């Protein structure tokens, strides 16, 4: 069921499949390779003189464990006994918040899969890296607290700042979505359009896995016509 979206390799395959059919609508994620299946094509990306940076992730990892950046194909593991890997082109020029990389954690409630019924919580989290960002070079690829935003290990940085004021969620290395959107709006950014584009990506991601969800659901509940006997909360 939800392993179609919760496992990185399955999610990658589903999104890549949709990109082949609808290239314009599914261009919102970086170039992706599932290893070892796409190993030959991925290896070819290292040809040429340009120093391309890639990020490698275990398909079943969490909290940033096992993630690394590389510019050298020789650093890519060849033993896949522990599971497949997902490789993506690293975005070297991200939008920064106070000079730090950040990501969003949004919460989505799925209450039906045939048809899809989706709700997005209006509040979310913004997680910041704990080292100021500079573009990747061969010398800084191992600086995980600069390149990655995972809370699990950034919280171990002595420079990590907790937000201790419940009345103000605009400081620290973990902030509220509302506070950051207000900041971006004050800076002149169109946050309404931003959220519409984020909602669009969430819907398209779930559309990509809807056939699988529907099949599993009806296999378990063949007589249910209400489309309401199961739910799932997803973190995007």
What is the meaning of each model-derived region?
Residues 1-53, 60-62, 72-78:
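Conserved N-proximal alpha/beta basic substrate-recognition cap immediately N-terminal to
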Residues 41, 45, 49-236:
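Catalytic core of tubulin tyrosine ligase-like
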């Amino acid at each position: 069921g939800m392993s179609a979206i919760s496992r990185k390799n399955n999610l990658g395959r589903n999104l890549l499949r949709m990109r082949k059919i609808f290239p314009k609508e599914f261009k919102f994620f970086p170039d992706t390779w599932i290893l070892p299946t796409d190993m030959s094509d991925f290896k070819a990306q290292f040809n040429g003189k340009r120093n391309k940076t890639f990020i490698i992730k275990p398909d079943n990892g969490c909290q940033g464990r096992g993630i690394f950046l590389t510019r050298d194909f020789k650093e890519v593991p060849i033993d896949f006994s522990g599971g497949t890997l997902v490789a993506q082109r690293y975005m070297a020029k991200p939008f920064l918040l106070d000079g730090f990389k950040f990501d969003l954690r949004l919460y989505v409630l799925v209450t039906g899969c045939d048809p899809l019924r989706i709700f997005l919580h209006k509040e979310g989290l913004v997680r910041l890296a704990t080292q100021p960002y500079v573009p990747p070079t061969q010398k800084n690829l191992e600086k995980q607290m600069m390149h990655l935003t995972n809370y699990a290990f950034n919280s171990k940085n002595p420079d990590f700042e907790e937000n201790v004021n419940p009345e103000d969620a605009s400081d620290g290395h973990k902030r509220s979505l509302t506070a950051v959107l207000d900041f971006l709006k004050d800076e002149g950014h169109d946050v309404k359009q931003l959220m519409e584009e984020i909602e669009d990506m969430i819907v398209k991601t779930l559309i990509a896995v809807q056939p699988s969800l529907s099949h599993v659901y009806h296999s378990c509940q063949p007589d249910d016509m209400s489309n309401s006997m199961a739910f799932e909360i997803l973190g995007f």
